[in-house]
Amino acid sequence: MADILTKIEAYKREEIASAKRARSLSEVLAAAEAASPPRGFVQTIRAKLASGDYALIAEVKKASPSKGLIRADFDPPSLARAYEAGGAACLSVLTDTPSFQGHLDFMVAARTATSLPVLRKDFMFDTYQVVEARAHGADCILIIMAALDDAAAKDIEAAALDLGMDALLEIHNRAELDRALKLRSPMIGVNNRNLRTFETTLETSEALAPHIPKDRVMVGESGIFAAADLARLEQVGISTFLVGESLMRQADVTAATRALLARGGQSSPQVVPANAGTHNP
C-alpha cells in the first residue's frame, strides 16, 4: 500500500505545485467563497437513512488502475442524472487523471446536472486541493488515512469544514480507524480493497464495523456488486454504500441502481460491455 501511495503522492505533489503556479491560493479561495453553497453531503445521507432507505453514494468513474477503462461511453451529466433517477443519495466523481482518467470538469458537469451533493474523489495531500474542490462546487472531499499522517489529515479536514464541506474518512484497518475517530468528521468509509493486491472482500467491513461508534455514518466501499451485498453489510450496521464500477458497466444505469437498492434482492445486475450506452426509462 505504501509503495502505491508513495507513487501517487509524488505525481499529486507535482500537480499541486503546477496548479498553485497557475492560480494562487487567494484566487482559488475567492472562487470557493463565491461558489454555490454546499448541499449537505452527510445531512442528505442521514435523511435517507432516517426514512428507512439505503443511502447510495453513486460513483462517476471512467477508469481505474486495476481494471483500466470501465466505460468508453462516458458522459458525466447523463450518468449523474441516471443515478439520481435510480435513487442515489449522493454522487462521487473521480477527478484524478493519471490513475482514473478523471477531471474536475467531470465533477462540475455531474453536479450541475443534478440536485445531489457531490464528493470530489481524489487523493488529497494539500489544503489547496480542498479549496480547489469547493471552488469547483464540491460538497465533500475524501481523506485517505493511509496516505496522510495525523497532522495532515487534521489540517485537510479543518480546511473542508471551514468551507462548509463534509469529509469522508477512508480506512482499511483498525489502526487507521482509531486515527480517524480522533477527527471531527462523522462519516467513516471502510474500503474493502487491499491496495497491495487490489483484491476485495466484504469481510474487511464486517471486521471493522463493530468498532465504529453507532453515531457515525459508516460507508461500505469497494467489492459491492449486488443487493445481497448491501443486505450482508446491513447486518453489521452499514447502510450507506459507495458503488462505482458495477453500476458504471450497466447499459441502463437507472434500472441497475434501482435493482441494487431494492431490499430483499439477491441477484447481481447483468453486466454489459463498458462501451454500452446510458439509457434512462
Curated annotation (Swiss-Prot):
Its EC number is 4.1.1.48. It catalyses: 1-(2-carboxyphenylamino)-1-deoxy-D-ribulose 5-phosphate + H(+) = (1S,2R)-1-C-(indol-3-yl)glycerol 3-phosphate + CO2 + H2O. Belongs to the TrpC family. GO terms for biological process: L-tryptophan biosynthetic process. CDD domains: IGPS. This is Indole-3-glycerol phosphate synthase. Pfam families: IGPS (PF00218). Keywords: Amino-acid biosynthesis, Aromatic amino acid biosynthesis, Decarboxylase, Lyase, Tryptophan biosynthesis. It comes from Nitrobacter hamburgensis (strain DSM 10229 / NCIMB 13809 / X14). GO terms for molecular function: indole-3-glycerol-phosphate synthase activity; phosphoribosylanthranilate isomerase activity.
